[in-house]
Amino acid sequence: GASALLIASVVLTFLYLGERSAGNTAEMLFRADTLWYAPLHISYSVGVDGISVAMLLLSAVIVFTGTFASWRLQPLTKEYFLWFTLLSMGVFGFFISVDLFTMFMFYEIALIPMYLLIGVWGSGRKEYAAMKLTLMLMGGSAFLLIGILGIYFGSGATTMNLLEIAQLHNIPFAQQCIWFPLTFLGFGVLGALFPFHTWSPDGHASAPTAVSMLHAGVLMKLGGYGCFRIAMYLMPE
């Protein structure tokens, strides 16, 4: 599975570069949209640009090496790789999401396995580290959810698609002053920005090697990517 992810990411990178070299100037390439829930205009909407392609390739390399680092992990090897795969799926899904709800869903999918991966297969004060990490990140998720809902209703859009909301550019400045701090705070906790970084050292110290690799190399980058993709992109003022 990890090998397939790495190969797919490399192929996607070359396809993306080929499209750009051919003169394709679309903001997002390889778009796919499927309506999930019509009343709230929730869609499974994915695509890639230069930033997301780079993050996908980085994530694939770390998942690939992390898989080999965990090859002889005991006990409950199958269960470990199940949760490790779910964590990886959340990370990849987050980077390709173009819909606010889809992005938040994959964000949560990436966070939930961390508790078990550290609490069960970690070392040292693993239960304390897992609980602290989970509580702080879920607290950040609550702020993020409020911010996302505020963006959706404040924009007056009939979609949760990031590109379409950005094109409307009609979130009032007064509301941006409310929703931007909430979304920035939500992603800032995951990005371990000061003073919300105290969960990170405990998590690194207690996590298995592969999880610590994914934690430092990819998971924390979700925070910075989310700040750029949602907070700054939709509320530039």
Task: List where the protein language model places each region.
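Transmembrane helix-loop-helix hairpins at membrane boundaries of multipass inner-membrane proteins
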Residues: 1-68, 72-82, 157-170
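Alpha-helical transmembrane segments of multipass membrane proteins
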Residues: 10, 64-68, 89-93, 116-117, ...
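Alpha-helical multi-pass transmembrane bundles of energy-transducing inner-membrane proteins
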Residues: 19-20, 79-86, 90-176, 209
